[in-house]
Swiss-Prot record:
Species: Yersinia pestis (strain Pestoides F)
Entry's Gene Ontology molecular function annotations: ATP binding; S-methyl-5-thioribose kinase activity
Protein name: Methylthioribose kinase
Function text: Catalyzes the phosphorylation of methylthioribose into methylthioribose-1-phosphate.
Family (UniProt): Belongs to the methylthioribose kinase family.
Subunit structure: Homodimer.
Gene field: mtnK
Amino acid sequence: MSRYHTFTAADAVEYARQFGQVADPQALVTADEIGDGNLNLVFKIRDTAGISRVIVKQALPYVRCVGESWPLMLDRARIEAETLLTHSQFCPQHTVKVLHHDAELAVMVQEDLSDHHIWRHELIQGNYYPQAAEQLGEYLAQTLFHTSDFYQSAQAKKAAVSRYTNPELCQITEDLFFTDPYIEHERNNFDPVLLPEVLSLRQDKALKLAVASLKHRFLSQAEALLHGDIHSGSIFVADGRLKTIDAEFGFYGPIGFDIGTALGNLLLNYCGLPGLAGPRDAAAGREQRLNDVQTVWQTFAARFLALSQEKAQDPALATEGYAAQFLQHVWRDAIGYCGSELIRRTIGLAHVADLDSIDDQEMRRACQRHALSLGRALILVAPHVDDVGGVVARIRQSPSSLTPQRC
């Protein structure tokens, strides 16, 4: 098999036998399609005992929920595989292992993570993994530092920026994050009862100026090789372990984007918890989410600083105090992108179960309103914040009262 064709289950089994790196390839006999996304086919390859051994993932040449009228380039499969391989080079313990990939077939074979669980599902169910936030911070620090100008040579970095140019998937992000939620668009999806809040966002000139700045940075700042879609649904967890998957949105962009989207998903769970659990469990879970937000940032920042002191290759960027100064700019970006994630996941095309799975309609609407107000506040306060503790304290005291003053 060399020319592109859409895999059947039988094709996936045969491919896994060739490239799955299992000791007994002929024992691989069945493939279950498990993908619930719109861009790919994903198969679990099982052996004669019914045990899942490897994953086969193939990119589709169109958006699945729309059909061939929305075509996509298959090169995104190469970008995803190479992003995961690069991230695995610097943080193998927290990156899914790529066993094989073929750019022409737009297919990749990955390790099976059946002994892990999707973090979003675990957060919704109230299952706490105390090491996950620290591990996520470590992953972000290792991958973003080692693909940045602090570590890469200027020549290597410029070549990598070109190699990881990902225009179609970046366009999706640009539209869904920074454009659609602030205009009337057919892709937007929200409860009509929320229309007053939606119209208020569209009419808020200060907010739209701040979002324009975030979008401009996303378009123009090639700071490091991002995962590009790091959220609690693209993170698998187990006791003491964490693995990231699904890096097809990978590209060179602003470091704060990966951090902000990760933090945004923790805060989406924070907003949804009153509708997902009883009062006592919701209060405890919300405190955990705020602690997780602090831990992710503090771990990332401390590790990034340590790496810059140990490994910074550029003598100018190694100047004492510069990395800390740079991280202030990253932090402010992260808070803005965090707010963007809250808004777009509430009223845009792609929602999250942290809000949408709330059974009680009035409670769900209240949680969605909270997400919108918190997202707006974070975007507006982002240029004025100095540290994570100040932001978390304000969220804890009064979730909707963030104002553009220094924290």
